[in-house]
């Protein structure tokens, strides 16, 4: 993995737009915010990715994540098996768009060429978000009166699980090159992501559809980060194993 034994990092936060007051579970709109956020950042990686798959929501991963969120534990699920995982906690509200943005924000600390993270920083959230082969995501959220492992009370806990998991030792999150130039067989390029047939059909049925291009060339893990946010201060606590 990328690092270990990371000390707490304290940052200041000014949030202008706060959305989502998630309770015991996520609404369809909230699920869309999370999924769209992941796909947006995956499509915008720099340098571009040759093989970035478009993510889709998975009900089984959602149920798995929700069940763990209900336990209100500030630690990774030791029984998650072959599932990637990102955790995020925030008070007094839960801003889902900001959560994904924050995970992706670790990009500035990550060097794709050397596959290294700036010492003392975290990159595991980001690399899971943009892990090219990860194509399924499911998340759960819970308002916890008390989260085991956090002193503060009244926190929202977000758990996202991924399949297949990212952050595999010795591997980069994606291959740099012309967008979609190495999409798997049967997938087409939609907004710089390798999308399946269903995604293409949905775009064709939409009045404001984006362009759909064929890949320019044919083609025949687990995040261990924790993010805790308390307004108006941000406390980023994490460890990568």
Where are these regions (language model features)?
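Mature extracellular or exoplasmic CAP/SCP-family domains and secreted bioactive peptides
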Residues: 2-241
């Amino acid at each position: 993995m990328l690092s270990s034994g990371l000390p707490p990092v304290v940052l200041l936060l000014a949030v202008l737009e706060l959305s989502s007051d998630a309770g015991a579970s996520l609404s369809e709109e909230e699920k869309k915010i999370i999924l769209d956020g992941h796909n947006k950042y995956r499509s915008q990686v720099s340098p571009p990715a040759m093989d970035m798959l478009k993510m889709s929501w998975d009900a089984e991963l959602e149920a798995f994540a929700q069940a763990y969120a209900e336990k209100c534990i500030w630690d990774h699920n030791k029984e998650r098996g072959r599932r990637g995982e990102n955790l995020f906690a925030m008070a007094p509200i839960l801003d889902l768009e900001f959560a994904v943005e924050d995970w992706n924000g670790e990009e500035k600390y990550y060097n794709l060429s050397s596959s290294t993270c700036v010492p003392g920083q975290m990159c595991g959230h980001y690399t899971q978000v943009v892990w090219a082969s990860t194509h399924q995501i499911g998340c759960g959220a819970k308002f916890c009166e008390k989260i085991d492992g956090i002193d503060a009370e009244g926190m929202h806990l977000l758990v996202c699980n991924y399949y297949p998991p990212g952050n595999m030792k010795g591997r980069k999150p994606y291959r740099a090159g012309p967008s979609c130039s190495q999409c798997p067989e049967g997938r087409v390029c939609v907004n710089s992501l390798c999308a399946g047939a269903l995604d293409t059909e949905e775009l064709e049925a939409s009045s404001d559809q984006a362009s759909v291009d064929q890949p320019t060339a044919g083609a025949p893990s687990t995040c261990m980060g924790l993010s805790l946010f308390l307004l108006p201060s941000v406390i980023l606590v994490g460890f990568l194993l």
